[in-house]
Amino acid sequence: METVTLTIDGRQVTVEKGKTVLQAAVDNGISVPYYCYHPGISIDGSCRVCIVKIEKMPKLQTSCSTTCAEGMVVSTRTQDVIEARAGVFEFLLVNHPLDCPVCDKGGECPLQDFSYQFGPEQSRMEFPRREFDGNGVRADVDFGPTLMLNRNRCILCTRCVRFMRDIDHDAQINIIDRGNGSQIATFQEEGVHSLLSGNLMDVCPVGAITTRDYRFKSRPWDNPFAADTICTQCAKGCNVTAWIKAKPEWAKGSRLIRFTPRFNPDVNDYWMCDIGRFEYHWIEGEDRIVKPLVKTGDVQQPASWRDATAGVSERLGAAGTSNPDGIRFLLSAHASHEELFLFKRLTQELLGDSGPGAITVTWRHREKPQPAETTFKVPAVDAPNVNGARMLGLAPGAPGAEQREADVSALRQAVEAGRVTALYVFDPGPEGSIGDVRWIVDARKSGALGLLVVQGVLMTDLARAADFVLPGASYVEKEASYTNQTGRLQGTSRAIPLPGEAREDWQILVNLGAALGVPFTYQSADEVRADIVGQFSTVTELQGLTTLAFNKPLEARSWLQASNPSERWKWDFMYQDLPPVKGNVDPTALPLPPGAIPLKQV
């Protein structure tokens, strides 16, 4: 790798040849503000706040568009740089409304932070601000099915324009009009229609583009915990951060407040799709199963775990004794390695060597409407662990839709013909992720299927038809491992506690195995993973299971550090220490408005 050495503010730094001055500064912890630059999209150089002084160059240069050269001497804090930068900030704030108290970006807004650190102390402008669609939150207009737009806040950094052009490859956003009337817009105000639209909120450095899902929901300082995990909504396995809101147990509403992308150049870069970002409300929704249910007659009744486990083991054991070939397992590819492995062991102990043949792994397959040139592709497979099932010998052959359809079709024919006396369904994903299973419900109604056990998270029509319902964990409530579409081994983190009496799925299976006489001795999921590595020592991709790191929910060190989550690599070091308050004003010496009561000084 070729490198160049340059000096920035008296520090010698060595960087890869071809990097810009701004990238060199950021990589070495030197604070340089910027708005229009984003590491995941093309360089524009339009905001001008990253200007620096470079020796032997007659004028100040934009550091985001200036390539590093050997021996270059750069200054970021000379007096002329400070004054020019403050002037740029003053112009950026000329028409920017003081909406911080009602703006969703407040508290994690680069415009707030950089203006405080680098901008002027006061404005010299006294004329009315330019307004496009009204003022305050009344200026918010529809910007598509997932977004809201406030043009008054826009600083025309063009990040959104370049994202749609460079990443989505569908230039739905453009700058229209000229001069003071310039604004971002879509064709005939149709708004943005894209599977990647939520990323526009991440790239927007101000509160111009916000999402309907997070709008007015919470403030960054009310989200004190964040867990780095992965998304399991499809086979891509995007690295994401789950944000948890501070909420007492008795308060209504969700603890899980939003998902944002986490940078990983090998998986999802800086982005995530709208499915993973917005379709998470089922996790804490009203349809969550929070207690074991046992059907008595035609009515499902809450039961203890002891009674439910004993009932399942008794009925499964009886079915295995009378007709071992009549026991089948239908597992969603949302199941983790640990869960798939335990099911495989369970069937081997119950049914012998032919046991794994009783397992059918299924998932939903749906094509996503995206331009062919899109850089960020969303897979058609709506499950995170099809590859993992194949490695464990439960989904032979290539993980394609044809194989899945053939396996499910064979199981369906057996169920409808009455050859299946007991069916155990494991569905830890969102509703529909296991595919179309209405045929199971129909088989129950017709009497073709005798025993149905459902282990899952949602009270679906399938769960309502079951004799036993065992409440499990969603992907943000357990530490579990998955292999994505490229063969990369990753893990989810436990971000929030389990609801009600729900349990982690490996615990349910270990307890069920014990009730059936299966010699499970696992005390933790770590022990399950170690056993997988031991029994599949020839499968190279699974050998990392014992060293896989699972992240714990971390306290947000500061909401400034979490600002603009898609760029957290920058904020983590840029705001180690907050700058001192400007000015030397004694708040107790300020005159009080008529009728105001002074605060008691302690």
Regions found by a protein language model. Name each.
Residues 48-232, 236-240, 245:
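Fe-S ferredoxin-like electron-transfer domains
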Residues 19-23, 336, 504:
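Short, structural beta-strand-to-alpha-helix junction motif
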Residues 98-137, 497-561:
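N-terminal leader/propeptide and maturation segments of large enzyme subunits in energy/redox metabolism
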